[in-house]
């Protein structure tokens, strides 16, 4: 089961009136924590039982753990509060670093703040 997380400066992610944009992240591109990259195309390839399908998520940031090179975790923007999914909450650390760089916090769907 995957958990949804949001990167926000607001007290509540679902009431964020001024969400972080990918352009803000781009301004700090040289400072991004290791493993993060900006992907302006945002086209994902997903393996299914029927072959490989593509999905366009628009410009995004992805994290690739050096110990898990076949797996990317995408932070989606799409005009909303940046969000990403993780199956294992113990893997939040790089996203907490990204949030700190943006003077923000990570919140789950229930509003619990992670630091």
Language-model features and meaning:
Residues 1-115:
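Acidic (Asp/Glu-rich) sequence patches and key acidic residues
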